[in-house]
Amino acid sequence: MKKLTAFVLSAMMVLSLAACGAKTETPADTSTPAADATKPAEVAKLTYAVEAGSAGEEVALANGYNVVSVDSQAKALMEVQADAAIIDSLMAGAMVGEGTSYPDLTITDQKLTEELYGVGCRKGSDLASFINSVMADAYADGVLEATAETYGVQAALVEQPASEFTASESDSDVQYIKDKGTLVIGITEFEPMDYQDADGNWIGFDADMAKLVAEKLGVEPVFTVINWDNKVFELNGKGIDVVWNGMTITTAAQESMECNNAQVIVTK
């Protein structure tokens, strides 16, 4: 298993922390707390921008940091509302540096925790087993790593064990999806996992993997933007077939959805 370095954005280049970012579940038993929870003096003096309602906000508050809850951490830095921003390492790498929206921000390498990213299907769905088999084959033949390299997340990949698809004996979700001819993928915009290119096409590591699964199913991929808080409702109501958008695999997620084997480990 490879681990990705954690990041924090810092306008003043004084300190770095990293934590979870947009649209993820609250960290549970998949998270590893910081090795040293004691706040040094310089940490106590700083104000950190965190996404309102995110796991990053929860981790920061648990560590006793001064926070300002915002919709855009990087924007808060540029407007001098905060000294640093807590955000997950994948998103930080995509939005900071030359050629990005925030070229003047810097990234540093102290971490708070780690999370596993995966996919959520309807509870009891055999689609999770199908996805595991596709990911295992993609890992074995190098497609998974090549796709990860395209979006700069190769260091975060989790090794995929060999896996064979086991179809449900009755009420097969895989057969339902094949019969209707589409795989409806619930997403939010979360670069580098799911985002739109200049032509409005959905791309990203998760988006490309979802397209691969749709190809193996012999159906068309359909991306639909969802309200993240309603993802389980959307699944159960068959408005979508899968949640595939940098989703943290937590105990709560596993209780309400059928989750696949994690594909990415993200340092916070």
Name the predicted role of every residue range.
Residues 13-17:
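Hydrophobic core
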Residues 18-28:
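Bacterial lipoprotein signal-peptidase II cleavage site
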Residues 56, 130-155:
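Periplasmic-binding protein-like
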